[in-house]
Curated annotation (Swiss-Prot):
It is an enzyme of class 5 (isomerase). This is Uncharacterized isomerase mll1393. The active site is at 47. Its EC number is 5.1.-.-. GO terms for molecular function: isomerase activity. The lineage of its organism: Bacteria, Pseudomonadati, Pseudomonadota, Alphaproteobacteria, Hyphomicrobiales.
């Protein structure tokens, strides 16, 4: 039996018991995929990260990301949380830049102190791209319990985007409509595109109206399943959402930063920072950033 240390962080927040929880299991050399999946199921968090030595010695670590049911090629809150956890573990309290190896590819991360708390941001390894969506937007709205007039605002329309993980981006009229969504799993399974052989793409609902004045968008992300569940902060969805922002809002050339609020309806308020660099009217690069705070640590006897 081997002892392995783990850390528990709340990500995309500066407050404990808010944001999106993440388990980071250290020293995972020797663990196979089956064991990692079983441990992730034991933690039963939205994601668990397993830290391994890097394939490239110039990089900091390799990480593998698991939900309780499957491995993911990339996810935002595990990247932010892992970057902060590994920097703090190494005693790196100042600014630092390093690369984490994920299944999607190398991810460049920067860790610093921001607003008095640890803050990490990473460059998207893959820029968002539009995918074909065959489902009727009104049917998508109905699967969320919304009327046709509540779907869309300004020039924003239902779309399908991916920056490694695909999401159906669904604009709704206002906060009241966003607060009423209830996913009908049966209806969703009949119309939603798949993100993999075993899972449907998740709906990412957003509106321009926000609770916090510094936020640019209010969002909710529901993971379909039996039962479905809500995610308090979803970095990979924010990465995909960058495509919708570029397509519908057409930001001018330069660097723009905006905050996305999520998790308020479920009592886990979260804030995700999205940075867009636009050149010649096209998205040249994008970054996802956020805070994280350590909540607990412990040992696994596996």
């Amino acid at each position: 039996m081997q002892t392995r240390n783990y850390l528990l962080y709340d990500v995309f927040t500066t407050e404990r018991l808010a944001g999106n929880p993440l388990a980071v299991v250290l020293d995972c050399k020797g663990l196979d995929t089956i064991a990692m999946q079983a441990i992730a199921r034991e933690f039963n968090l939205s994601e668990t990260v397993f830290v391994l030595p890097p394939d490239n010695p110039k990089h900091k670590n390799r990480i593998r990301i698991f939900t309780p049911d499957y491995e993911m090629p990339f996810a935002g809150h595990p990247t932010v949380g892992s970057a902060i956890a590994l920097a703090e573990l190494a005693g790196e309290s100042g600014a630092g830049i390093f690369v984490l190896e994920e299944n999607i590819g190398p991810v460049r991360c920067a860790v610093s102190r921001h607003d008095g708390a640890a803050f990490a941001e990473f460059d998207l390894a893959k820029l968002p791209e539009p995918l074909q969506l065959e489902a009727d937007p009104q049917a998508i709205g109905a699967a969320l319990g919304l009327a046709p007039h509540e779907i869309g605002f300004e020039n924003h329309r239902v779309a399908f985007w991916s920056a490694g993980v695909p999401y159906v981006t669904i604009p709704v009229a206002n906060l009241e409509a966003a607060g009423r969504i209830r996913l009908d799993n049966q209806a969703w399974s009949e119309l939603a595109p798949r993100k993999s052989e075993w899972a449907f793409a998740s709906p990412y609902v957003y509106c321009r109206e926000t609770v916090n004045h510094e936020s640019a968008f209010h969002v909710r992300m529901i993971v379909p399943g039996t039962p479905s569940y809500e995610d308090p902060a979803t970095g990979s969805a924010a990465a995909a959402f960058a495509g919708a922002i570029m397509h519908f809002d057409a930001p001018t050339d330069g660097i723009s930063q905006l905050w996305i609020e999520q998790g308020l309806e479920m009592g886990r308020p979260s804030r995700i920072r999205l940075e867009l660099t636009v050149q010649g009217g096209k998205l040249a690069s994008a970054r996802i950033g956020g805070h994280a705070v350590k909540v607990a640590d412990g040992k696994l006897f596996i």
